[in-house]
A protein has these predicted regions:
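Canonical Rossmann dinucleotide-binding motif of NAD(H)/NADP(H)-dependent dehydrogenases/reductases
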Residues: 2-34
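The beta1-alpha1 cofactor-binding region of Rossmann-like NAD(H)/NADP(H)-dependent oxidoreductases
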Residues: 58-68, 100
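Substrate-binding pocket helix/loop in short-chain dehydrogenase/reductase
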Residues: 94-95, 102-104
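Active-site helix of classical SDR
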Residues: 118, 154-157
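A short, exposed helix-loop element centered on a Lys and neighboring polar residues
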Residues: 118-119, 163
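Residue(s) in the substrate-gating loop at a strand-loop-helix junction
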Residues: 138
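C-terminal beta-strand-loop-alpha-helix "lid" module of Rossmann-like NAD(P)-dependent dehydrogenases
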Residues: 170-220
Length: 323
């Protein structure tokens, strides 16, 4: 089948997200695109061009919903050539205090949601002797960052799952492409941060601003435009030889360097980068001395975000002793 007539299913396509842009990018390449999202967000796909893109309800956390959506496409087209596993949610907060329900939800959607889609689509792709599965990972799936351990872990699982599937599905002519986005401009960060504004942290209540800042970290001024990103991915996926990985977007160079660094050095660099972004917040909150982030501490294997917590604890203890 020609690339101009490929049937593409994309999950998580509400307007404002990257999935919405994937749909438009594949449609520009004359693919038959099926955009999907949960029932509450169906209206957010209403202005996708109906002559090029069809919309349908799909909840990746529900096996019944996934099966129904896939069967609907098969009944209309007889095949699915490309699956873009884009649906996902943010999960921000310190692991020691983030609720297990929130962590489970991140895995349910970000990781198991992709696997549910794969298990429903693969039998059809195998019968047609070909297809491409495009799993959306993240740079933090390779290099985890503070305050986002749950999200990082869910994406790390996607990376491992994709690399395994690539080998297991090769005998059936099915390509597996792992997309590793950097900082891409979308509503993802704002949606995540809004959920955190009124969260009642206990141990970390004084770090609330820093945690919210982490949720917005991917949406800085230099974030890559989502349209540019989606077009790049679509072009690569539709090529005669799709790559195993597509790494693209702001900050991917930094994270690629960190992923090849020795573990101790990688962690220091990640923490120092995060510290630079949130240091002003910390200084306002805790009056931390810049010298505590320099000198011997910065080069030691034991230096990590815990030093900031320790500095704060020491300051609190001194204040209590003086009062």
């Amino acid at each position: 089948m020609s690339d101009h007539h490929k049937v593409v299913l994309v999950t998580g396509c509400a307007k404002g997200g990257i999935g919405y842009e994937y749909c438009k990018a594949f449609a520009e390449q004359n693919c038959r695109v099926f955009a999907s999202d949960i029932s509450q967000r169906m209206q957010d796909m209403a202005d996708l061009e109906p002559d090029k893109i069809e919309t349908l309800e799909l909840d990746v956390s529900s096996e019944k919903s996934v099966a129904s959506a896939v069967e609907s496409i098969i009944s209309k087209c007889g095949r699915i050539d490309i699956l873009v596993n884009n649906a996902g949610i943010g999960s921000t907060g310190p692991l020691a205090e983030l609720s297990l329900d929130a962590i489970k939800k991140a895995y349910e959607i970000n990781t198991l949601g992709q696997l549910r889609m794969v298990q429903q689509v693969v039998p059809y792709m195998a019968s047609q002797h070909g297809g491409s599965i495009v799993n959306i990972g993240s740079v933090v799936g390779q290099v985890p960052t503070p305050w986002a351990g749950s999200y990082c872990a869910s994406k790390a699982a996607v990376h491992a799952m994709s690399n395994t599937l690539r080998v297991e599905l090769r005998p059936f002519g099915i390509n597996v492409v792992l997309v590793v986005p950097g900082a891409i401009r979308s509503n993802f960060g704002s949606n995540s941060s809004e959920r955190l504004v009124n969260y009642d942290w206990k141990l970390y209540k004084d770090f609330k601003e820093a945690i919210v800042e982490r949720a917005r970290a991917s949406q800085g001024g230099k974030a890559t435009d989502a349209t540019v990103f989606a077009r790049h991915v679509a072009q690569k996926v539709l090529s005669s030889r799709p790559p195993k990985q597509i790494v693209f977007g702001h900050m991917t160079g930094l994270f690629a360097m960190l992923s090849w660094s020795p573990l101790w050095d990688k962690y220091n660099l990640v923490v120092e980068y995060v510290i630079k972004r949130i240091l002003l917040i910390f200084k306002r909150k805790f009056n931390i001395d810049n010298q505590s982030l320099k000198g011997d501490n910065a080069g030691s294997a034991g230096y990590d975000i815990a030093h900031i917590l320790l500095d704060y604890a020491k300051q609190q203890l001194r204040q209590e002793q003086q009062s």
